[in-house]
């Protein structure tokens, strides 16, 4: 049974209904519609924690999607799945690919910063303050870029940047 017919969550059902309407009324090439269907099913599976299924759908959407902007969101979501699975190196690869296609994707910059910050915290726990500082500096760079694109967002990151003296360096 297609995922679009299995949604139990109200938000997922609403998204699916709206997506189905858009697929019918917006003129698209057949490949674009199919790519969007896989993307939609990937998002639905991801929201339910079905990460393997989400990845299968996203990879299929990537195979079919030709628009770089749309591909950036698929790549971003693949990165999210890898982040959720604790595969931070893979996640970073996908966030970077998303940013190559769409440099104005603050959420990819934010998630990249979060991973850098996490790695900085790991370095502190391992007794390596120099490596930690390098990771924190990297996190600061990505957060500043994200904040520049979305000034009203990432308040915790803005506070961290101010508290640590990294804001505007």
Swiss-Prot record:
Record's bilayer topology term: Peripheral membrane protein
A GO biological process held by the record: photosynthesis
Keyword Electron transport assigned: no
Matching SUPFAM superfamilies: TPR-like
One family name in Pfam for this protein: TPR_1
Compartments where found: Plastid, Chloroplast thylakoid membrane
A cellular-component GO term for this protein: chloroplast thylakoid membrane
UniProt superkingdom: Eukaryota
TPR repeats by residue range: 35-68, 72-105, 120-153
Keywords associated with the record: Chloroplast, Membrane, Photosynthesis, Plastid, Repeat, Thylakoid, TPR repeat
NCBIfam families to which the protein is assigned, alphabetical: PRK02603.1
PANTHER family registered for this protein in UniProt: CELLULOSE SYNTHASE OPERON PROTEIN C (PTHR44943), TPR REPEAT-CONTAINING PROTEIN MJ0263 (PTHR44943:SF8)
Family, per entry: Belongs to the Ycf3 family.
Functional description taken from the UniProt entry: Essential for the assembly of the photosystem I (PSI) complex. May act as a chaperone-like factor to guide the assembly of the PSI subunits.
The protein, known as: Photosystem I assembly protein Ycf3
Lineage: Eukaryota, Viridiplantae, Streptophyta, Embryophyta, Tracheophyta
């Amino acid at each position: 049974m297609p995922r679009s017919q299995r949604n139990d969550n109200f938000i997922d059902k609403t998204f699916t209904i709206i997506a189905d309407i858009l697929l019918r009324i917006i003129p698209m090439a057949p490949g674009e519609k199919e790519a969007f269907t896989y993307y939609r099913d990937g998002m639905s599976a991801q929201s339910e924690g079905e990460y393997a299924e989400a990845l299968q759908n996203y990879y299929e959407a990537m195979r079919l999607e030709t628009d770089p902007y749309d591909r950036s969101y698929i790549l971003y979501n693949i990165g999210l799945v890898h982040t959720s699975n604790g595969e931070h190196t893979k996640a970073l690869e996908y966030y970077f690919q998303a940013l190559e296609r769409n440099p104005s994707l603050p959420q990819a910059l934010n998630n990249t910063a979060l991973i850098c910050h996490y790695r900085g915290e790991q370095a502190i726990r391992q007794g390596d303050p120099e490596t930690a500082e390098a990771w924190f500096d990297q996190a600061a760079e990505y957060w500043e870029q994200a904040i520049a694109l979305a000034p009203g967002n990432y308040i915790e990151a803005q506070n961290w940047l101010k508290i640590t003296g990294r804001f505007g360096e």
